[in-house]
């Protein structure tokens, strides 16, 4: 497998966006491009096993580190920070356009996980893609997102780019409380070794700024509004862990699925054992196979 790193300007005008491209060494029978839009706190480098699996089957895998994640560090803040939600959407488009220019005749598939799933759901034009996979997404109240964003904007005036333990607890604390007696981050990964890898990864960013929460809430609010008229003009597959609190333990993601299904019959859903990050948990091989089978159809 060939792994290429590219730096291109982010649409926020400050960040050097880190793009990773994984390609088979033999390119005589390429099947398509798979773009990954990763989750919160993580980065594209965590998808090496995914890339190995799919490059061995003739796909090129690529994706960018979202603003303030991984190697896409922003000079505006040392923690998770986004100045404008739309910049994350535009960066995803920029990454696709960069790679598609090199492989103009290959179909493009889109995978969004968690934070990445909301970026995908707020993308205006999905026509360049043949299919999409949304993992660990949910249905949040647009009204609640507006209320919380207004409160945080007032409380943290002048400190929007600074790390906040309260914001971190607001975003992640409630998930852990649903698994009393379990280790920290069990809501994310059920496997002990996988959790250790995650916790020990120096590129995982846990510090969260109020600005990040506010912009993320805008994305969730937009995704919630879009359920009235989903932008799912392409086939969509939803995947989730049965114990995933982000997906509402199946209730939230199924609400999104039903809205998509009404708009496009070519929509499917499947659940797996596990919590939130099923792509990196002990059941990851069955997830990979499910995705590979879906892309082949």
Task: Tell what function each PLM region has.
Residues 81-100:
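Alpha/beta-hydrolase active-site loop
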Residues 238-240:
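Short beta-strand/loop motif that positions the catalytic acidic residue
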Residues 1-26:
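N-terminal cap/lid segment of alpha/beta-hydrolase-fold proteins
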Residues 44-76:
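Conserved alpha/beta-hydrolase
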Residues 38-42, 114, 242-243:
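Active-site glycine-rich loops that stabilize anionic/oxyanionic intermediates
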């Amino acid at each position: 497998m060939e792994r290429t790193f590219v730096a291109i300007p982010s649409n926020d005008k400050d960040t050097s966006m880190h793009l990773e491209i994984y390609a088979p060494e033999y390119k005589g029978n390429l099947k398509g491009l798979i773009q990954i839009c990763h989750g919160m706190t993580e980065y594209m480098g965590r998808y090496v096993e995914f890339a190995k699996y799919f490059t061995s089957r003739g796909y090129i895998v690529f994706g960018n580190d979202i603003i303030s994640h991984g190697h896409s560090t922003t000079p505006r803040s040392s923690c998770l920070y986004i100045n404008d939600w739309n910049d994350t959407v535009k960066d995803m488009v920029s990454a696709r356009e960069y790679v598609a220019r090199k492989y103009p005749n290959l179909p493009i598939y889109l995978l969004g996980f968690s934070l990445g799933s909301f970026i995908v759901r707020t993308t205006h034009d999905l026509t360049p893609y043949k299919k999409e996979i949304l993992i660990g997404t949910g249905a949040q109240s647009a009204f609640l997102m507006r209320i919380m964003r207004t409160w945080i904007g007032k409380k943290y005036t002048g400190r929007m780019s600074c790390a906040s333990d309260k914001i971190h607890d607001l975003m992640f604390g409630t998930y852990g409380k649903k698994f009393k007696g379990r280790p920290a981050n069990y809501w994310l990964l059920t496997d002990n070794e996988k959790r250790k890898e995650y916790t020990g990864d120096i590129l995982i960013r846990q510090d969260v700024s109020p600005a990040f929460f506010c912009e993320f809430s805008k994305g969730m609010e937009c995704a919630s509004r879009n359920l009235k008229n989903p932008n799912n003009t392409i086939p969509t597959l939803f995947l989730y862990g049965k114990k995933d609190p982000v997906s509402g333990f199946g209730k939230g993601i199924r609400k999104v699925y039903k809205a998509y299904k009404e708009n496009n019959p070519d929509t499917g859903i499947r659940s797996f054992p596990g919590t939130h990050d099923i792509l990196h948990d002990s059941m990851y091989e069955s997830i990979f196979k499910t995705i590979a089978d879906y892309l082949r159809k």
